[in-house]
UniProtKB/Swiss-Prot annotation:
It catalyses: tRNA(Asx) + L-aspartate + ATP = L-aspartyl-tRNA(Asx) + AMP + diphosphate. Pfam families: tRNA-synt_2 (PF00152), tRNA_anti-codon (PF01336). It comes from Deinococcus radiodurans (strain ATCC 13939 / DSM 20539 / JCM 16871 / CCUG 27074 / LMG 4051 / NBRC 15346 / NCIMB 9279 / VKM B-1422 / R1). It is found in: Cytoplasm. The lineage of its organism: Bacteria, Thermotogati, Deinococcota, Deinococci, Deinococcales. ATP binds at R206, A207, E208, R214, H215, L216, E358, G406, A407, E408, R409. Residues 185-188 are annotated as: Aspartate. It comes from the Bacteria. Keywords: Aminoacyl-tRNA synthetase, ATP-binding, Cytoplasm, Ligase, Nucleotide-binding, Protein biosynthesis. This is Aspartate--tRNA(Asp/Asn) ligase.
Length: 435
């Protein structure tokens, strides 16, 4: 029979010393020493030790109810234990878990961990990572609302890609070809004409056949777009403030999770260092002997560049600016020459590196209709496939720009998680559709 007492959470026990409380949660661990039974109960706020006699303990992960008196105990988790007066099994586990949830480190194949993700995600470290991400996303929303942004929701079934048609998942839309959205980019820009400052928190889909520790085919994208800017510096300034606000929130809400995972919350400089892509390539080549080819920085170059700024400026963050046109999509605003003419080689695009990995791409976008149509032609795209997007630029779009942060990448780097898949509850990569 359910106790009439109101439920108490484990984190509230210090407020109830000497009182009788009701706890509800999961059997995290158990020991039977003959006449005395020890039960570690886990709820959403933590774990606590419960001690009783004559108890028949169910299998681990069973959900249970404990009624008992709170007593200070220096060796118990959290410094308190509950002396059991009444015990009830709410829902019994029917078989042993494939891994021992209480273990802080599991010596099993990483793929096995994901195969049994519905259970392993209950682990304290796994739960902590997702809790940090939830706080991060909430802080993202709160800061942007404070700066006058409006949250929007854009289609995830689209007729064309935001980045030229590559890396799209095709679907059959009632007999018509369609795709899963790889980015809300085009809709974000359209909505600048409505709310001026917008953001979205939503999944995006990339049909990229990567098998790396930094890529997912479905991930949570934190997207921002703002109008009436001067140039990309306004956008980088916003992201600088946003990240500082997020870290401040994490210090207030998530210290326990960071301590559990052995991670530290970074300081965000008042002015995150900037370096142009060309200078970054030269620095990495000359200082570290790592030649950089292609149109972007490779992963090792990102790591070395981050190392340089951590050592020389004490910053875990660095903006890499002035990306070449070949490395940016058609809507990236070109740099202008001193005479005001268009520089056909360089854009006002940037990336943000954090602890050795890119977590953001952003920049100023083209807002002039003629320039946009010229860019679409230069990229050899079909104008008719983008008419729903380009139409709005006939009607006074302001200078605007924005960025997107990959929530899982940021979470993984914050917490020292080696593979981005473990920063998502149920990851999707090129080999995984379940659970």
């Amino acid at each position: 029979m359910t106790s009439p007492l109101k439920r108490t959470l484990t984190r509230e026990l210090p407020q109830h010393e000497g009182q009788t409380v009701k706890l509800q949660g999961f059997v995290h661990a158990r020991r039977d020493l003959g006449g005395v039974q020890f039960l570690v109960l886990r709820d959403v706020t933590g774990v606590t030790q419960c001690v009783g006699s004559g108890l028949t303990l169910p299998l681990a992960e069973s959900s249970v109810e404990v009624v008992g008196k709170v007593k200070a105990h220096p060796k118990a988790p959290g410094g308190f234990e509950v002396q059991v007066e009444d015990f009830r099994v709410i829902s019994a586990a029917t078989e042993a878990t494939p891994v021992e949830i209480p273990k802080m480190e599991w010596n099993v194949n990483p793929e096995t961990m994901l195969d049994y993700r519905v259970v392993t995600v209950r682990g304290l470290k796994e739960r902590a990572a997702l809790k940090v991400q939830a706080e991060l996303v909430d802080a993202f929303r709160a800061h942007l609302r404070g700066e006058g942004f409006t949250e929007i929701s854009t289609p995830k079934i689209v007729s064309a890609g935001a980045e030229g048609g590559a890396n799209l998942f095709p679907i059959d839309y009632f007999g018509h070809p369609a795709y899963l959205a790889q980015s809300p980019q085009l809709y974000k820009q359209i909505m600048v004409g409505v709310f001026e400052r917008v953001f979205e928190v939503a999944a995006v889909y990339r049909a990229e056949e990567h098998a790396t520790s930094r890529h997912l085919n479905e991930y949570l994208s934190l997207d921002v777009e703002m109008g009436f800017i001067e140039d990309e510096e306004d956008v980088m300034g916003l992201e600088n403030r946003l990240l500082a606000s997020i870290m401040e929130r994490l210090r207030a809400t998530s210290q326990a999770e960071f301590e559990l995972l052995g991670a530290t919350i970074p300081d965000v400089p008042a002015h995150i260092p900037r370096i142009t892509l060309m200078d970054a390539r030269q620095l990495v080549t000359e200082k570290y002997g790592h030649p950089v080819g292609g149109k972007d920085l490779d992963p090792e170059a990102e790591r070395l560049l981050s190392q340089h700024f951590a050592e020389t400026e004490g910053s875990d963050f660095v903006f890499v600016t002035k990306y070449p046109r070949a490395a940016r999509p058609f809507y990236a605003h070109p740099e202008l020459n001193e005479d005001g003419s268009v520089n056909g080689e360089v854009t006002r695009g940037f990336d943000l590196l954090f602890r050795g990995i890119e977590i953001t791409s952003g920049g100023q976008r083209i807002h002039d209709y003629g320039m946009l149509m010229d860019s679409i032609a230069a990229y050899k795209l079909k104008p008719e496939s983008l008419e729903g997007y380009t139409e709005v630029f006939k009607y006074g779009m302001p200078p605007h720009g924005g960025f997107a942060i990959g929530a899982e990448r940021l979470t993984a780097k914050l917490l020292g998680i080696a593979n981005v898949r473990y920063a998502r509850a149920f990851p999707r990569d090129r080999h995984r559709l379940t659970p």
